[in-house]
Amino acid sequence: AEVATLTNSALTLKGTTPTLTIGDAGAEDTKIVFDGNAQDYYIGLDDGTDDLLIGLGNAVGTTPAISIDENLAITTAGDITMGGTTPTLTIGDAGAEDAKIVFDGNALDMHVGLDDSADELVIGKGSALGTTAHIITDTNGIVRMPLQCSFGVRLNATVNNATGDNTRYTVPFDAAEWDVNSDFDLANNKFVAPVDGTYCFNAGIALAQVATNHTQIDAFFYDETDNWYQHNLDVGNVFNNSNNYYFTLSATIKMAAGVDVVAQVQVANGSKVIDVFGASYPFTWMTGFLVG
């Protein structure tokens, strides 16, 4: 073997195209080793993987910090710190393609990326942009959460003789205008919170056959624990000339996952003759969404 040792010297390659070649095309690792006092480092070609490695120690393939493969894909084995006065990480080269960061999890992958076809910043599930988007921001700063809990339901047909004699009546919403995650249980006429959070609810209830002897009306959202009272008055003095009365409810409620919410109405001091209007459009209705 031929060995050249330079002591207390520097090696300079000159010329128009100075080149230093490590290796002779043989099937072996080639490397440069930096022989330090406390730590050694190497830069080398790992012949087994055909990757260029920068690593700790003097043996190629052990404790690599950075590897570059034949497709120019770079893999780092440690943390990356960007310093300077204005540290910037740029993803993409202004090409007409998606650019993204993928978080490769154990059971679930997530991504943050620029969807080039829509010109939108997307945060979503999986590794492919445009599929299962959770948060979308467009060029105008409009933010959408297409999978956020949101619903609108209505009473499809009029229910006769629901209250009037102090019966506390749960409005049986049975048709959905929309329900993003199917969180409203139409079979049991109630909303079921999918996650812990704060929810906003609104409702409009239309009553018929109200009479002057119906002197009290109460209406509220009920969340299995509390009555969120919205309405209390002498309904027998405020109905219209068709003996109908329309009113709305609104409440923001902090709920645990699995808790139910229903809309209820109770009219007292008269006969049980009051109907709740229903229709093929939102006549008596309820909406809600997750605030956060």
Residue ranges and their predicted role:
Residues 138-292:
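Extracellular jelly-roll beta-sandwich "head" domains, especially the C-terminal globular C1q domain
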Residues 3, 65, 134, 188-190, ...:
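Short basic coil micro-motifs at the edges of alpha-helical modules that engage polyanionic partners
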Residues 6, 45-47, 68, 114-116, ...:
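Generic beta-strand structural signal
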Residues 2, 9-64, 70-132, 149, ...:
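Self-maturation zones of extracellular/virion spikes and adhesins
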